[in-house]
Amino acid sequence: MAVITKIEVQKRSKERFNIYIDKGQGEEYGFSVNEVILIKHGLQKGLEIDEIALGNILYNEEVQKAYLQAISYLSYQMRTKLEIEDFLRKKEVGQAIISEVVSKLLHDRYINDKEYAILYTRTQSNVNRKGPTVIKRELLNKGVQDLIIMHSLQEYTKEKQIENALILIEKKKKSYQKHSFLQMKLKLDEMLVRKGYSRDVIQICLEELKDEKDDEKQQEALHYHGNKYYEKYKKYDGWTFENKMKQALYRKGFSIDEIEIFLQMKREEG
């Protein structure tokens, strides 16, 4: 049995208190607690506490400490239940305490996976223009349940997905100006798949791109790659030269007709 002999406010934190006790051998430092724990357990000078009571106080102090760590972590941005659990595990907090902290955070509405999923979907679709497949995968990795994800994705309509995908295409296609139209389409297709768009949405967007095919830019790309390969393969003669040129340009996405026209032009120049 111990008796509390003195309670002092810590110099560095006005919300923490040092508790001094006497176990029969004079006053000594016992432990420190948060103000919440001080009030919860009615700690005051003269109070007698046994080992069981002390263990309970110290356990609740650990819970409060972990709770405040979680609150601080949440102050930067919203988090999912799993993210909080993982954060506390990295802090080497025990599972029993983690469960209590998460339960309290849920009760106090500091964490809510449904609200998180809705806001996350809006941000990733409107700001980063990610497709639903990527958003779903990211939410699953954050521990959000399938049904919650399905609900959050309902407001991400197909029309909005197409709008976002077309914006991404418009931004990216400028960097493919030296590619053939076919190769540009393939690269844009790959980009949209990485961004998380469905095959259906990608096909619709690339069909719209087909209507914008620029013959002049296609010719510029053909001449750019054609001249580059011409310099590379001009050391070869006859059939070998033409075969290597055709293979190289075909791999770049140019049609046989386009390649033949380019080679004919080179023959006339030569």
UniProtKB/Swiss-Prot annotation:
Its main location: cytoplasm. InterPro entries: RecX_HTH_1st, RecX_HTH_2nd, RecX_HTH_3rd, Regulatory_RecX, WH-like_DNA-bd_sf. The keyword Oxidoreductase does not apply. Gene3D superfamilies: Winged helix-like DNA-binding domain superfamily/Winged helix DNA-binding domain. GO terms for biological process: regulation of DNA repair. Keywords: Cytoplasm. It is found in: Cytoplasm. GO terms for cellular component: cytoplasm. Pfam families: RecX_HTH1 (PF21982), RecX_HTH2 (PF02631), RecX_HTH3 (PF21981). Modulates RecA activity. Belongs to the RecX family. This is Regulatory protein RecX. It comes from Bacillus anthracis.
